Each structure stands twice: as C-alpha cells, then as structure tokens.
Amino acid sequence: MLDLKLLQKNPEVVAKALAMRHSDIDIATFTTLDTRRRALLTEVESLKSERNKASAEVAKAKRAGEDASALIERLGGVSERIKALDLEAEAVKSEQNDWMLTIPNIPHESVPEGRDENDNVEVLRWGTPRAFSFTPREHWDIGVALGGLDFERAGKLAGSRFTVYWKWAARLERALANYFLDTHISANGYTEVLPPFMVNRKTMTGTGQLPKFEEDLFRLESWDYFLIPTAEVPLTNLHADEILEEGDLPLGYTAQTPCFRSEAGSYGKDTRGLIRQHQFTKVEMVRFAHPERSFEELERMRGHAEALLQNLGLPYRVITLCSGDMGFSATKTYDLEVWLPGQDKYREISSCSNCGDFQARRANIRFRPAGGGKPEFVHTLNGSGLAVGRTLVAVLENYQQEDGSVIVPEVLRPYMGGLERITA
C-alpha cells in the first residue's frame, strides 16, 4: 500500500510513477474520495463544537431553573447529524482504503521505463552455453525416456499442468530443495521456516495478492482460505501487526513449500513439461530490512540465488525488469533466467524483488529505531532461491548426454547417495 500522505500531498508524483507502469488507474478517484472524507471530518468537528456549546447552554438553563426543552431538542438533532456524518465518513474511508489496495507499488528511480518484457534490461551473463555434438532434447522427452517424469498418470490423477515424479526424479527434486535450503541456512544466514500452505484472506492481502489477483489463486470456498502461490506470502506475514527491533534487522527466512497457481491467462503457454504447473516446489527467501539498506539487501539476495546456479554449473543471465513488467508489490525486480538448450533460450528461474514499505504498510510491519522514537515501516524483500522444478528442468537439459543419460552435478551427488549418472 502506498503512503497515504504521499497521495494526499503529491498526487501528481504518484500519477506519473504509475504511468510508468502503463497503469490505467485514475488518481482523481482518490482525490475525490479524500476531499469528501476531509470535508466530512471538518463538518463533524464543527458540529461537535456546536454540541459542546449546546450542552453548556442546557446545563446553564437547568441551573437557572429555565425550560431547556428547545435546547435539548437542538442538541439531539446535532448528535444525530454527527452520528450520520461519522458513518458516512467511515464508508468513504473504507472505499478509499479499498481503492488503495488495488494500486501497485511505485517503481524505484533505477528501474528502466518500459511496457513489457521486451523492454527489460540485461545486466549480466554467467557461463557459456554448452556446445552439443547432438541435437539437445527438451526436458519432458528426457524425463519420460528415463522413467522419472509421468505426465500421463498425473493427468489421470489431477488433469493438465501436473506431474508425477518417479524414482530418480523424485529424489533429484528433493536433492535440489535440500541443497538450496542447506546453502541458505549454512552459508547465507537464513532461518528455516515451515509455514502453513494455506492462509486466510488477510494474509493474502498483506503481500498484495488480494484483492486484485484472486483469479490467480486456488481458494477453499467453504473456509475462505487460499493455497499459497509462493512462500513469500506466509513468510512475510509472520510479522504482520508486529514491531521489530532495529538491532534485529536484517532478518532472513527461507522455506521450501509447494506453490499453487491457477495460471489464469496462460492458456496455450508452456502446455508441455514442468515450466508452468498448477503445483510446483520452490525454495523462497524473504528478508526484512532497514529502509536505508534495503537495496543493499536486494543485491545480496540476488547474489544468493546466483551462487546456487553457479555451483550447479548452469549458465544464466540477470535482467532488470522494466516498469511495465514488474509485479504488483515490487519497487524493483531482478529476474534470473537459466539457459535451456532444449528450448534454445533463457527461462526465468528466480525473481528477486525489493517491495520497499509497500507490503509492510498493508501488513502493518514496523520496527522500533534503536535510539527511540516513533516506529517505522520496515522494507520487505523476497526472492526465489530457487524454483525447484525449473532447476530440475535446467539440470536435465544442460547435463543430458547423447546416449540419453544425464550427469548429476557434483554438488548434488551427496544428496543423491553418490549417484553420478541418471540412466534408464
């Protein structure tokens, strides 16, 4: 949620920033509501002053033994008017708040302006894509041929965009997740968390999935609970309505969870394989940072994700998302895209974002300055560290051999019981 004072004092600044996102949001809606709310509050204060004056006159008349019925009747009318205006002001405030919950975050000044993914800016590339002596296959062919990925039975169990992992594939998925977690905990200082996989509406609102993107979520209708689309949701909301201590910042949490997405609007995209699933495993990184150091934390988090890819020997590139391609809650985002030789292109495997105080305002997450003073909103960050299924895809495609086998990256072999090569 944006700062109410910023919207009130500099609506034109907000309008310009949102225009960078190519948003059709009309700031005049907020201005109209805010003007009405302020007018109502002013009228209420004036009537309260009148009520106090009338109360004093009633008391004076009674002390003098005079008839105060007319004054009492006028006092009752004023009180009823105040009550009605209070209700109207509350309704306007609620409408204003609902409007603010649909407004995306403002892009940071370092974010390139653009409309969509075609305007994203490449920052760097790491690793050289392997030169194959044969035509590399796509992961779904490799996985099925080796007896590890079963899309047919998954379709029988659940439908499209689901996968059954067998034998080595199930173990490789688990190995990747454990390797990611162990690295984040031991090398990067994160605290591991195992959160609920379904959350309430308030929690989804805190991180920005609701109210605008409900169609992207899986909802348990009878309970009004939602399956999490990412562990960012429960991890960030762990400190909702709390005041942290400045000395405890930054805080870093990591979790391995299933993620559930309806993929609304993705009809016809990535219909084969593991790239776009209704259920997938991801290891998430979430950080709570001091406002003055959140962009340092963004670079650090990006480095944590990059190191995983480097240790796996997977070529990748880093891009800065343009203003029109960023997620709703982000003020700046880096995407890491891994090279997939079977598809002959880079595909997203991690997204690392600084959300500034946007989520903290929605979830009411603050910190107490070390020197005392009024609590301030923290800055929240989140990043994939990494998407497990997509990393499995990258391993299969980059380490495939001409005979159909797949070499297991060295860092994963301890998690695979020493297995060096996957064969049928």
UniProtKB/Swiss-Prot annotation:
GO molecular function, one term: ATP binding
Uppermost EC category: ligase
Keyword ATP-binding in annotation: yes
Keywords annotated in UniProt: Aminoacyl-tRNA synthetase, ATP-binding, Cytoplasm, Ligase, Nucleotide-binding, Protein biosynthesis
One GO process term, biological-process aspect: selenocysteine biosynthetic process
Residues that coordinate or bind L-serine: 230-232, 284, 384
NCBIfam families on file: serS
This protein's domain notes: Consists of two distinct domains, a catalytic core and a N-terminal extension that is involved in tRNA binding.
Subunit structure: Homodimer. The tRNA molecule binds across the dimer.
Family: Belongs to the class-II aminoacyl-tRNA synthetase family. Type-1 seryl-tRNA synthetase subfamily.
Name under which the protein is recorded: Serine--tRNA ligase
Name of the gene this protein is made from: serS
